Amino acid sequence: MVYRTPIAWMFALSAMGCKKVDEAPKEYESALAYMFEHFDDEDPERLVETVEFLDEWLVGADLEAAEEGLSIQNLPQSAVGGLAGHAHKTDGLEGVSLATSSRYPTCMLMEALTQYSFARMMPDVYITYDREFDSGQDCIATRDCLWAEGSVYSVADWGVLGEVTADRRIEYRWIETAEGWAFLQRWWLTEESTGTRLGLSIGDQYYIGINFPDGDGTRRIHGSWLTMEMVTGDASTGASKQLIKNWKKDAEDLDAWISANL
């Protein structure tokens, strides 16, 4: 982890906010918002259709753009109104998305993400990662069940921004597509996340992950919307751009961990 002085860190967030990130096409950002809002639909047909659309869309120049990172428009309030936790809002959210790839199949990614602690997989980031499943942990990796959900309490090391605590609800779901089994991830903050320095607070954050077969490996799509404040004011734009950098590193770290441990 790279440590910066507070002034340098605030400048970096400001610079990231100024750096242009291409806007996602409407059909792409609408697909991500749909997947988040309808994640728990009983009938998976439209979810499957949306995954297959994204699979077909992510080729050529569109794939290259998504692998660099795209800005996405806000979630509708209807997507968050029924979520557990505090009174969720979508006002002022900044959204970004990134496409990454893994050389491992979806079943191995699901195993890593649900059966092992992120504090073990990413020890340079997580000081604490306490996860408790309400259902599905013992069967989701083998697809003996198609749904798992639970809660996470984490403390992350953000360098000069201090230790950042977060409480999340997490959900995982398998769906079967024409190309094979895909899995979806959804999480959101159940209360404001806070840091120990520079007045950092994340009022709301929502995440959608879409993972589907790509040859012998997996194509992964990440999308997130958040609001963040610091002593300098609204830091949402800079924070959302930092997510792109983080996701790229996390994807590499996850593959490296799987290679060494599974």
Residue map of PLM features:
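Eukaryotic helix-grip
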Residues: 21-262
